[in-house]
Amino acid sequence: MTRLFMLVCLGIVCQGTTGNILRGESLNKSLPILHEWKFFDYDFGSDERRQDAILSGEYDYKNNYPSDIDQWHDKIFVTMLRYNGVPSSLNVISKKVGDGGPLLQPYPDWSFAKYDDCSGIVSASKLAIDKCDRLWVLDSGLVNNTQPMCSPKLLTFDLTTSQLLKQVEIPHDVAVNATTGKGRLSSLAVQSLDCNTNSDTMVYIADEKGEGLIVYHNSDDSFHRLTSNTFDYDPKFTKMTIDGESYTAQDGISGMALSPMTNNLYYSPVASTSLYYVNTEQFRTSDYQQNDIHYEGVQNILDTQSSAKVVSKSGVLFFGLVGDSALGCWNEHRTLERHNIRTVAQSDETLQMIASMKIKEALPHVPIFDRYINREYILVLSNKMQKMVNNDFNFDDVNFRIMNANVNELILNTRCENPDNDRTPFKISIHL
């Protein structure tokens, strides 16, 4: 194995050497399936209402693709990109089951599924639940993932009451690249430091088409758009191949994840094998300047493109490995080098494009006295993105899955475990 040299200082992004990422001892461990679907259907309230939706084109099962998931208590949220035939973009999984799988129920109700006057949710591309029991929803405003229908916006719900707390439009000059005119808001990370005040909540939004990072301050509703060459896609890696089927993606920064331990925001361009991060301490004040922001990372450290990312409270970064249909990890207590990266799960059947991951605490079925030992579990959504892009789903097969696994068990006996002799997180050089 070739050891990767990396310099993390002076704002330098380093070049990685080649060599395969090691596969962990738990590679063949399958992720338990929580829910699965051949296709998505909804709880319309009555058969008559469902038939009306089908006849009018409001619902077409062939055009419903999940983009994100999250869980709060017994509610599991599923967002659907708004294509023609998608009746609701923000949903929860109901207790009813249809021919395709569990039925979806619009959240908080059907009124938010209507968007003709732009008052509802057009396309909930991503969502996040913070420690204050708030649901943050990123609405791209796009139909068919390309056509602007309404201005993009950020919505916040109180999960204890299901009431809308706030809705903020994202200005056009922030939401799109001023030079290219391109924009598609595709990833979301929320940093809530103090639940008693609004001033300590910041939101990070990735624009994968316009190759930009947007920082939102909840205290004054200010938006800042940042640019960096680390956000740009790499032309060498625009071909995405999953289970032998390929498509092209000329997309930049996406798949963001915020570390609760180091406050690093991790990301990768869609078309890239690199892994980058920026420390969010630099954004705490609203008077920061673009040229003062320092980005770190390693170019071409992965063997394939990466997708969704998430960081556990103990500092384990998980990421989807697109071409391998696998789940990779790296521990922030170790240096960001290739030999410290592991593949901990792989399945050509169930892990075709990991589209979303979330870290939650205490598996619901774990006895209360064991939850302090096995605190964290990971939720994983796979959605066969290649089938969506190429429009060749077989809806007689299972196409979409939500899986979960205990974090400690997943990384057991791999380098993603915390080193016994070092409990200090990987040090970062920050220049403010």
Curated annotation (Swiss-Prot):
Which domain of life, per UniProt? Eukaryota
User: Which residues are annotated as modified residue Histidine amide in the UniProt record?
Assistant: H431
GO terms (molecular function) for this protein are: sterol binding
Tissue specificity remark: Found in and secreted from the hypopharyngeal glands of the worker honey bee (at protein level); expression peaks at 12 days post eclosion. Expressed in the brains of worker bees (at protein level); found in antennal lobe, optical lobe and a subpopulation of Kenyon cells in the mushroom body. Found in the ommatidia of worker bees (at protein level). Expressed in the spermatheca of adult queen bees (at protein level); expression levels are higher in mated queens than in virgin queens. Expressed in queen bee ovaries and male drone testes.
Instruction: List locations, semicolon-separated.
Output: Secreted; Cytoplasm; Cell projection, Rhabdomere; Cytoplasm, Cytoskeleton
Sequence positions that bind 24-methylenecholesterol: P364
Q: Where is the signal peptide?
A: 1-19
Give the record's GO biological process terms.
Answer: caste determination, influence by environmental factors; defense response to fungus; defense response to Gram-negative bacterium; defense response to Gram-positive bacterium; killing of cells of another organism; multicellular organism adhesion to substrate
Pfam families per record: MRJP
Keyword tags: Amidation, Antibiotic, Antimicrobial, Cell projection, Cytoplasm, Cytoskeleton, Developmental protein, Disulfide bond, Fungicide, Glycoprotein, Secreted, Signal
Q: Tell me how activity varies with pH.
A: Optimum pH for protein stability is 4.0. Protein becomes unstable at pH above 9.0.
Where exactly are the transmembrane stretches of this chain? none
Q: List the disulfide bonds.
A: C118-C150, C132-C195, C329-C416
Induction entry: Moderately down-regulated by the ecdysteroid 20-hydroxyecdysone (ecdysterone or 20E).
User: Modified after translation how?
Assistant: N-glycosylated on Asn-28, Asn-144 and Asn-177. Glycosylation is required to prevent apisin multimers from aggregating.
Protein family according to the UniProt entry = Belongs to the major royal jelly protein family.
What does the further note read? Exhibits a growth factor-like action on primary-cultured rat hepatocytes by stimulating DNA synthesis and protecting cells from apoptosis induced by serum deprivation. Also activates mitogen-activated protein kinase, as well as protein kinase B, a key regulator of cell survival.
Q: Subunit structure, briefly? A: Is present in royal jelly in different forms: monomer (55 kDa), oligomeric subunit (ca. 287-420 kDa), and water-insoluble aggregates in sediment after interaction with fatty acids. Component of the apisin heterooligomer complex consisting of 4 copies of MRJP1 and 4 copies of apisimin, associated with 8 molecules of 24-methylenecholesterol; apisimin forms a bridge connecting two MRJP1 dimers. At low pH multiple apisin octamers stack to form filaments that increase the viscosity of royal jelly; these filaments may be stabilized by bound fatty acid chains.
What protein am I looking at?
Major royal jelly protein 1
